From Swiss-Prot:
Function statement: Bidirectionally degrades single-stranded DNA into large acid-insoluble oligonucleotides, which are then degraded further into small acid-soluble oligonucleotides.
Pfam families given in the database record: Exonuc_VII_L, tRNA_anti_2
GO cellular component: cytoplasm; exodeoxyribonuclease VII complex
Organism: Bartonella bacilliformis (strain ATCC 35685 / KC583 / Herrer 020/F12,63)
Catalytic activity: Exonucleolytic cleavage in either 5'- to 3'- or 3'- to 5'-direction to yield nucleoside 5'-phosphates
PANTHER family named among the record's database cross-references: EXODEOXYRIBONUCLEASE 7 LARGE SUBUNIT (PTHR30008:SF0)
Protein name: Exodeoxyribonuclease 7 large subunit
Length: 476
């Protein structure tokens, strides 16, 4: 027994690994060999997202089962919620989990497959959005009759955009803005929603003009091809658009959720172009017809009223008829007035003749004398007034002369008048009393002053007078 435990191991060339080494080696082999793969399968064991936001489930078919995980960042980007039993195509990277010796796929994109699964998902989404009122007819906006600018959301390289441009230019040429998007694939829904929101974000007067109408168009295809136009983000963007939207996705039998949210659904992209703009020639013909009818109607209107006016004119009396009665009355009144004046004149003449017979020649002479006296009286009164005015003028002239020679004017120029006790002017120095009172009259008043030492003052004054005698005379 002891020999058994002490026996040396048999020599071999097989490499020896630890559990973790072999697990990591398998992990590298799987990841390097396969990398990214697309796997079709049925979702199994899905119970919704974990508390962390990640989702753990399995993909299976009738023979095998593969564990799968979707991280939170990818879950937020999915265009539909995964459901138990849904057939999908998962795109991701194969890897292993060394802790439990399991291999799994880390899903980075997930899309439904199979018509049944897609139809179920479509119906559920349609019901949900309809309950929110996104498809209500009351929310539909009227389309402009003649838009100036049309925004088109579609692929820039497909036949759809060429058909739309060709049809619009045939009917009514105008400005077209194309917002290029992918019309199929995983990013289709997000790009279409961003395009609709982008057109609404433009403002009037900017570098890029804001369209008056938006057309979202795509050619026909399968349910999977058109799935991007069933995206919830597309429906909400179209519903929130302030610009009217025409949906033209697929053929007439193809219905997507954008058709329910749009303001008008066209069976084809060509039909959308025809609905967007009227035919210019039809408008011109219609305007010409309206113009012609207007001219005819206007001519009829004038003819009718001209005939009516002529009838009214014929019913009106002429000028002679209008003035015949007043003229006749005027003539009668003129004749009566002339006769009345003649009669009155004759009466006055007869009356004055009768009065003249009543006056004697003496009375007539007295009347003539009275008239003469009245005339002479008037002439005398007028002569008296003229004489009074003449005398008044002479008095006023004398007053002005007297005022000009008044000594008050001299006092006003700065001179002083000396008055003695008798209030007579003192003209010479010798007239001053030796002692006593004299009055000095100024322009604005009078003051009494006393005199003394007349001899001294007189001699001084005499010298001054002699020196100035030749230059200035006496004041008075």
């Amino acid at each position: 027994m002891a020999d058994f435990f002490t026996e040396k191991p048999v020599a071999t060339n097989v490499a020896e690994f630890s559990v973790s080494e072999i697990a990591n080696a398998l992990k590298r082999v799987v990841e390097d060999k396969f990398g990214y793969v697309r796997i079709r399968g049925e979702i199994s064991g899905y119970r919704g997202a974990h508390a962390s936001g990640h989702a753990y489930f399995a993909l299976k078919d009738d023979k095998a089962r593969l564990e799968a995980v979707i991280w939170l960042s990818v879950m937020k980007k999915l265009s539909f919620p995964p459901e138990e039993g849904m057939e999908v195509i998962a795109v991701g990277k194969l890897t292993t989990y060394p802790g439990s010796s399991k291999y799994q796929i880390v899903i980075e994109a997930l899309e439904p497959t199979g018509v049944g699964a897609l139809m179920t998902l479509l119906e559920n989404r349609k019901k949900k959005l309809a309950e929110e009122g996104l498809f209500d007819a009351a929310n539909k906006k009227p389309l402009p009759y003649m838009p100036k600018i049309i925004g088109v959301v579609t692929s820039p390289t497909g036949a759809v955009i060429r058909d739309i441009i060709h049809r619009i230019f045939d009917r009514f040429p105008l400005h077209i803005l194309v917002w290029p998007v992918r019309v199929q694939g995983e990013t289709c829904g997000r790009e279409v929603a961003s395009a609709v929101e982008g057109f609404n974000a433009l403002f009037l007067g900017g570098g890029i003009p804001k369209p008056d109408l938006i057309i979202v168009a795509r050619g026909g295809g399968s349910l999977e091809d058109l799935w991007g136009f069933n995206d919830e983000a597309v429906v909400r963007a179209v519903y929130a658009s302030a610009i009217p939207v025409i949906s033209a996705v697929g053929h007439e039998t193809d219905w997507t959720l954008i058709d329910y949210a749009a303001d008008w659904r066209a069976p084809t992209p060509t039909g959308a172009a025809e609905r967007a703009v009227p035919v210019k020639l039809d408008i011109e013909v219609h305007l010409a017809s309206i113009n012609s009818r207007f001219r005819v109607g206007l001519a009829r209107y004038f003819d009718f009223h001209q005939q009516k006016l002529r009838a009214l004119v014929r019913g009106l009396p002429t000028v002679d008829q209008l003035f015949a009665l007043p003229r006749r009355g005027f003539d009668e009144i003129s004749s009566r007035l002339q006769r009345a004046l003649c009669v009155s004149y004759d009466k006055k003449c007869f009356y004055f003749h009768a009065l003249s017979l009543r006056f004697s020649p003496r009375l007539l002479n007295t009347k003539k004398a009275q008239y003469a006296i009245q005339e002479y009286t008037g002439r005398l009164h007028r002569a008296f007034l003229r004489n009074v005015e003449k005398q008044r003028a002479q008095v006023e002239m004398a007053c002005r002369l007297l005022k000009s020679t008044s000594y008050q004017n001299i006092l006003e120029r700065g001179f002083v008048l000396a008055l003695g006790k008798d209030h007579k002017p003192i003209k010479r120095l010798m007239q001053l009393p030796e002692t006593g009172q004299i009055s000095l009259r100024f322009f604005d008043g009078e003051i009494d002053v006393s005199t003394h030492d007349r001899a001294v003052n007189r001699s001084l004054k005499n010298k001054r007078i002699k020196s100035q005698k030749d230059d200035q005379g006496l004041l008075f």
